[in-house]
């Protein structure tokens, strides 16, 4: 990759990181959960960069999003390992959706709606599931004391985190499908 393409990729990563953080802060003002988490479209910029540039750019954008969240203090932290799971691992994991970049781009370019929807929803599902898994582990280990008496810690963590992750997954999948059906050029990068 030549220097100008690298520069474009780095600028896009920076812009999408900022967009993800801003979207998360704004959504947290309206739909914030008591022990952290919110229904949010903050994953959209990370998915977008993953589809444009692939897994490495997606992982980088997610990692930077988590680091910026920590740096600005937009977090709910109990322990350093919990911080790592809920911010670094969870947000970076969204970038794994870049594994679907090729199929998403091909479906968008060929204007095959069915394939585009399947590719986007699959990618968003995997990215969301990996993020959810990091939050569930963190919740079970570090927030078990919040579980109602008699409720197993893992059940509490699975349920609590699903209350915001499932709607976030659905909203992100719908928005990205609509976005790419109407503007497939957003998926083009200098890499493609």
UniProtKB/Swiss-Prot annotation:
What outcome is recorded for mutants in which this gene has been deleted?
Cells display deregulation of thiamine biosynthesis and impaired export of thiamine products from the cell.
Q: What is its main location?
A: membrane
Gene Ontology, cellular component aspect: plasma membrane
Which ranges does the record mark as transmembrane? 10-30, 31-51, 57-77, 81-101, 123-143, 164-184
Q: Note the coiled coil stretches, chain numbering.
A: none
Keywords on this record?
Cell membrane, Membrane, Transmembrane, Transmembrane helix, Transport
> How does the record say this protein sits in the membrane?
Multi-pass membrane protein
Gene3D superfamilies assigned to the protein according to its UniProt record, in alphabetical order: 1.10.1760.20
GO MF terms on file?
thiamine transmembrane transporter activity
User: Which is one Pfam family of this protein?
Assistant: Thia_YuaJ
- Which cell locations does it reside in? Cell membrane
Q: How does it assemble?
A: Forms a stable energy-coupling factor (ECF) transporter complex composed of a membrane-embedded substrate-binding protein (S component), two ATP-binding proteins (A components) and a transmembrane protein (T component).
Reported function: Probably a thiamine-binding protein that interacts with the energy-coupling factor (ECF) ABC-transporter complex. Unlike classic ABC transporters this ECF transporter provides the energy necessary to transport a number of different substrates. The substrates themselves are bound by transmembrane, not extracytoplasmic soluble proteins.
Record's family?
A: Belongs to the vitamin uptake transporter (VUT/ECF) (TC 2.A.88) family. Thiamine transporter subfamily.
What name is this protein filed under? Answer: Thiamine transporter ThiT
Lineage, opening ranks:
Bacteria, Bacillati, Bacillota, Bacilli, Bacillales
């Amino acid at each position: 990759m030549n220097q100008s393409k690298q520069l474009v990729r780095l600028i896009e990563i920076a812009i999408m990181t900022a967009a993800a953080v801003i979207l998360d802060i704004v959504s947290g003002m309206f739909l914030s959960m008591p022990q952290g988490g919110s229904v949010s479209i903050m994953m959209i910029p990370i998915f977008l960069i993953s589809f444009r540039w692939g897994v490495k750019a997606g992982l980088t954008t997610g990692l930077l999003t988590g680091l910026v969240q920590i740096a600005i203090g937009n977090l709910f932290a109990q322990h350093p390992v919990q911080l790592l799971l809920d911010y670094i691992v969870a947000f970076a994991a969204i970038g794994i959706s870049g594994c679907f970049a090729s199929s998403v781009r091909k479906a968008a370019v060929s204007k095959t709606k069915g394939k585009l929807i399947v590719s986007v929803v699959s990618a968003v599902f995997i990215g969301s599931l990996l993020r959810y898994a990091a939050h569930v582990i963190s919740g079970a280990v570090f927030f078990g004391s919040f579980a109602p008496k008699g409720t197993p810690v893992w059940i509490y963590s699975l349920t609590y985190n699903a209350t915001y992750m499932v709607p976030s997954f659905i909203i992100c999948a719908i928005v990205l499908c609509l976005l790419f059906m109407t503007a497939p050029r957003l998926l083009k990068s200098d890499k493609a």
